[in-house]
Amino acid sequence: MGVNAVHWFRKGLRLHDNPALKECIQGADTIRCVYILDPWFAGSSNVGINRWRFLLQCLEDLDANLRKLNSRLFVIRGQPADVFPRLFKEWNITKLSIEYDSEPFGKERDAAIKKLATEAGVEVIVRISHTLYDLDKIIELNGGQPPLTYKRFQTLVSKMEPLEMPADTITSDVIGKCMTPLSDDHDEKYGVPSLEELGFDTDGLSSAVWPGGETEALTRLERHLERKAWVANFERPRMNANSLLASPTGLSPYLRFGCLSCRLFYFKLTDLYKKVKKNSSPPLSLYGQLLWREFFYTAATNNPRFDKMEGNPICVQIPWDKNPEALAKWAEGRTGFPWIDAIMTQLRQEGWIHHLARHAVACFLTRGDLWISWEEGMKVFEELLLDADWSINAGSWMWLSCSSFFQQFFHCYCPVGFGRRTDPNGDYIRRYLPVLRGFPAKYIYDPWNAPEGIQKVAKCLIGVNYPKPMVNHAEASRLNIERMKQIYQQLSRYRGLGLLASVPSNSNGNGGLMGYAPGENVPSCSSSGNGGLMGYAPGENVPSCSGGNCSQGSGILHYAHGDSQQTHSLKQGRSSAGTGLSSGKRPSQEEDAQSVGPKVQRQSSN
């Protein structure tokens, strides 16, 4: 009997740097590449049409690339535990290969399939290629626990063995004499389904802003590396109105689905840096997005409750409000704040928003205005975001809601000033909220302040054609800051508000709240497309807020919180350079004292 092999695709939807597939082919007489799709899951899961379309395009591209090698992709309907025992017998399988899945659900699923394979006498090959590192080795190096600060994570990574080079791309030379048995009715039996077949209504569906697939991913990678301004100094470009739109060099959805190898990206960045900088060693900051991705994966890998508040040992238990009506307004872009509504509209239409836009809407939903649980926001992102990833999505929402990782709760994003600072003319608002197109720039971020005559000229009456603001931001955010202060005062490890809530950690970095050490960088994305990490990059300017109504060129409210004060008063904001956030680093103690010190005159909330 010959050696009949199967490679099971899940993530890792590519032929480049696919070590499990490459090893599976070696010594095999036949190879079949399968993707198992559960049609019932498509109709019942919390995944929107844009993500499904992206996945199906990835599968179509993978099938097209396999065709060039005289092979095909086998898309099989069903559940893995039901499908594999049948395939093992029907195809006389002797070898199965998979890419290692670090997430708890994936590990549980794969353990069950390995058991079935062993019982059937099938050899199982598992190789790591969705992450840069073996996460278990990082945890082992840290005394058996995941590192809970990024600084500790960086220390551990610096002690790891150098990364292996990406595996050779699967070509006809790699496949050699290994062939794929194909039948005439392959498309009927194993073809990639359409959205309609999965039960989606595609009427009115606009064309994809982010086309799925490995071919597109590699094209974007080359574009990304060719950008002259970025290549020249390896700094991210300045934030402007165009930054809010989908970029042809964005990579985050492709890393999420494994159309692009993180290892290939890593080494391409390294090679380019050495070429431009004349062989000098690249700093860790060059790999910002990739390393933060690894950090969240490491934090989540042994925590099946990572996406929950209850039962999650690293999450602060905050008594969030339950308000389905308010949640729906936020999710559907009906808050009455054009900046928030435009972001949520772009997300629903295109499946992607800039990481600073993610900051704004996450803060608004949770600690900023609505006081609704981060779990609800995470579910909406899971449905709509192309690059939503279980570990990174949950980690980002915990972080932005000040539930874990980072407790800078006295900074609050203004839903008026933040957008105005980024896009003063309001072009972004007009693009995604055409109902407001007629408003002049002066009022487009706060149209409720426009005189009735201007509203009539704009053909948009606030409260009739566009909703009034659902909350008073100045009042709501002040109340929520006070709530957060009281919650953190109750935490046993809390050390006061004078510093940026640096939660103490023990020698192996396992502080209970994943607090950052002073001077440590907060999560950042590289310029690769602003993926699910939602972080600031070093050197990036972040708008600051000036005053309670946030109506003039403002972005972040800075609250003073003297110990004797029950209600926190607003502090006049300074320029973005005045806060530690502008550099992506924690402020020093001196800077922080300036930003949030108690010596602040009380202001009216009117």
From Swiss-Prot:
The keyword Transcription regulation applies. There is a cross-link at K11, K107, K159, K329, K485, K585 (Glycyl lysine isopeptide (Lys-Gly) (interchain with G-Cter in ubiquitin)). A motif (LIR 13) lies at residues 492-497. Residues 471-493 are annotated as: Interaction with TIMELESS. A motif (LIR 8) lies at residues 379-384. A motif (LIR 6) lies at residues 285-290. GO terms for molecular function: DNA-binding transcription factor binding; double-stranded DNA binding; E-box binding; histone deacetylase binding; kinase binding; nuclear receptor binding; nucleotide binding; phosphatase binding. Changing G336D: Abolishes transcriptional repression of target genes. Abolishes interaction with PER2. Residues 3-132 form the Photolyase/cryptochrome alpha/beta domain. A motif (LIR 3) lies at residues 151-156. Induction: Oscillates diurnally, rhythmic expression in the early night is critical for clock function (at protein level). In SCN, exhibits circadian rhythm expression with highest levels during the light phase at CT10. No detectable expression after 8 hours in the dark. Circadian oscillations also observed in liver, skeletal muscle and cerebellum, but not in testis. It holds the Pfam family FAD_binding_7. Changing Y287A: No effect on its interaction with MAP1LC3B and moderate decrease in its autophagy-mediated degradation. A motif (LIR 10) lies at residues 411-416. The LIR motifs (LC3-interacting region) 3 and 5 are required for its interaction with MAP1LC3B and for its autophagy-mediated degradation. Component of the circadian core oscillator, which includes the CRY proteins, CLOCK or NPAS2, BMAL1 or BMAL2, CSNK1D and/or CSNK1E, TIMELESS, and the PER proteins. Interacts directly with TIMELESS. Interacts directly with PER1 and PER2; interaction with PER2 inhibits its ubiquitination and vice versa. Interacts with PER3. Interacts with FBXL21. Interacts with FBXL3. Interacts with PPP5C (via TPR repeats). Interacts with CLOCK-BMAL1 independently of PER2 and DNA. Interacts with HDAC1, HDAC2 and SIN3B. This is Cryptochrome-1. It comes from Mus musculus. The lineage of its organism: Eukaryota, Metazoa, Chordata, Craniata, Vertebrata.
